[in-house]
Amino acid sequence: MLDNQLLRENPQYVATQLLKRGFQFDAVTFSQLEEKRKALQVSTQSLQNERNLRSKAIGEAKSRGENIGPMREEVNKLGAILEQQKTELDEVLKQIEVISLSLPNIPHESVPVGKDELDNQEIRKWGDVPAFSFPVKSHDELGEALGQMDFALAAKITGSRFVVMKGHLARLHRALIQFMLDIHIQQHGYQEIYVPYIVNADSLLGTGQLPKFEADLFKLTGDNGYYLTSTSEIPVTNTVREMILSAEQLPIRYVCHSPCFRSEAGSYGKDTKGMIRQHQFEKVELVWITKPEDSYNALEQLTQHAEIILQRLNLPYRVVALCTGDIGAGSAKTYDLEVWLPSQNTYREISSCSNMEAFQARRMKARFRNPDTNEIQLVHTLNGSGLAVGRTLVAIMENYQDEHGNIHIPDALKPYLGGIDIISVK
């Protein structure tokens, strides 16, 4: 959510900044609603004061034994007008809130201006793209040939965009989770956190998934209004909702492993085969809560921490700065890490690292006390995948395959697999 004061005082500036995203904000309509709000608030306050004065006069007249009938009738008329204006004011406030909740974040000045992913800017590359002397296979072909990855069975159990893994591939998948957690906790200094995989609407509103992106979520039946979490960013970030932190507590750095559940609305026809786009997948998430002045340095650190996982696994990747037309609605700036997939002969996203600035904090009322001014200020929140586990498995399978369809284990993962160094076709 954007700053209400900024919206009220300079809606045209907001409209200009959001236009960089391709988002049309009707500043004129918003300003008209604001003028109506101010007029109604002044009017209702005036009517409230007038009614209070007249009610007091009725009490005084009654104590003197005077006829208060006409006076009471006038107060009742005032009360009816007041209630009508309160109703109008509530309606205007709701309209303003709907608009405010629909607005995306203002992009940081360093974000490249562009329309879509074609305008994203490559920042750096790491690692050499492997050259194979044989026709490469996709991860799903490799997994099915190994007899350890079964999409048809998953479709029978549930439906499309699910997978059943077993044997060494399932073990490799689990090893990746532990490896990522160990690096982030032991070497990067994150605190591990375990959170619910089911969240309520307030949490989703706080991090910005609601109201705009409900179609991307799995909502549970019943009266609780619960949803399966689409990323552990949601519950982890909401741990500071409606809190006033001390400056000494910042920065907070959490790492969390969780399953994620996404409906993939709008993804019809995209990545229909394999594990690239699933309804259920695992992710190791990094979340930072910082002071405003520290958040962009934190974004660089968070991104580097995610990169280190790819480097330890010796997976070629690149870092891309998303343009204004491609960053997520709540993000002020985002770096994507894209890993090389030989079967597609291209880089594919494996992590998004974002600075949300105060966008989520304002929704969540997540604040801290500034010791220099003693003022209560909004924190900044950041998040990034460190990494998406399924896509990391995909990248290992494809980059570490041999001509026989075997998968060689990266050196960094061998201690997690009891000495297994190859997953072989039987």
Swiss-Prot record:
GO terms of molecular function: ATP binding; serine-tRNA ligase activity
Keywords: Aminoacyl-tRNA synthetase, ATP-binding, Cytoplasm, Ligase, Nucleotide-binding, Protein biosynthesis
Pfam families: Seryl_tRNA_N, tRNA-synt_2b
Main location: cytoplasm
The organism's place on the tree of life at top rank: Bacteria
EC number: 6.1.1.11
Catalytic activity field: tRNA(Ser) + L-serine + ATP = L-seryl-tRNA(Ser) + AMP + diphosphate + H(+); tRNA(Sec) + L-serine + ATP = L-seryl-tRNA(Sec) + AMP + diphosphate + H(+)
Residues where L-serine binds: T231, S232, E233, E285, S385
Localisation per UniProt entry: Cytoplasm
Pathway annotation: Aminoacyl-tRNA biosynthesis; selenocysteinyl-tRNA(Sec) biosynthesis; L-seryl-tRNA(Sec) from L-serine and tRNA(Sec): step 1/1
Any single biological process term in GO: seryl-tRNA aminoacylation
Binding-site residues, ATP: R262, S263, E264, E349, I350, S351, S352
Annotated Gene Ontology cellular component terms: cytoplasm
PROSITE patterns for this protein: AA_TRNA_LIGASE_II (PS50862)
Similarity comment: Belongs to the class-II aminoacyl-tRNA synthetase family. Type-1 seryl-tRNA synthetase subfamily.
Role noted for this protein: Catalyzes the attachment of serine to tRNA(Ser). Is also able to aminoacylate tRNA(Sec) with serine, to form the misacylated tRNA L-seryl-tRNA(Sec), which will be further converted into selenocysteinyl-tRNA(Sec).
Quaternary structure and interacting proteins, as annotated: Homodimer. The tRNA molecule binds across the dimer.
Record remark: domains: Consists of two distinct domains, a catalytic core and a N-terminal extension that is involved in tRNA binding.
UniProt protein name: Serine--tRNA ligase
